[in-house]
């Protein structure tokens, strides 16, 4: 009797586990559109991404990779220019498009969005300092255009 009762209880417990263990949650169907919206060259795209980054929990169902090494081996704030957030968004684009298997098709736009972000940083400065910032931004942009692909292939992001 005890053996039979133990078997029935074990079977009931397993049924409960199976019943509550439902299928793994898939990312929402609009994930590619959200990713695209957050990686465009416009200020609106940048601002939407910054807002989402500040509230990542609201986007957890999408499974985005928010990790960043900022500007990789380059200074995050060269000569005092705050490029860190632009680098973080660039990393976001590289990492998530690589995970989606569509990095090659989007790399150029991601690099252009990075440059647009850097230019927006530079726009806040007066003529002389802006020229220096713009020159530094151009250098960072050329670096990601030239070396971003190889870095994305080996698992790091160059931003």
Where are these regions (language model features)?
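Extended terminal accessory/targeting regions
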Residues: 2-9, 16, 20-159
């Amino acid at each position: 009797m005890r053996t039979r009762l133990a078997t029935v209880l074990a079977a009931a417990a397993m049924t409960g586990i199976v019943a509550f263990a439902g299928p793994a949650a898939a990312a929402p169907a609009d994930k590619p559109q959200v990713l695209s919206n957050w990686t465009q060259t416009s200020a609106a795209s940048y601002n939407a991404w910054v807002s989402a980054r500040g509230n990542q929990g609201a986007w957890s169902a999408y499974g985005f990779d928010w990790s960043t090494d900022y500007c990789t081996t380059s200074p995050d704030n060269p000569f005092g220019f705050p490029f860190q957030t632009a680098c973080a968004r660039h990393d976001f684009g590289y990492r998530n498009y690589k995970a989606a298997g569509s990095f090659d098709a989007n790399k150029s736009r991601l690099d252009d969005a990075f440059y647009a972000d850097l230019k927006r940083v530079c726009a806040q400065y007066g003529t002389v300092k802006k020229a220096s910032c713009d020159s530094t931004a151009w250098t960072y942009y050329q670096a990601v255009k030239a070396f971003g692909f190889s870095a994305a292939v080996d698992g790091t992001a160059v931003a």
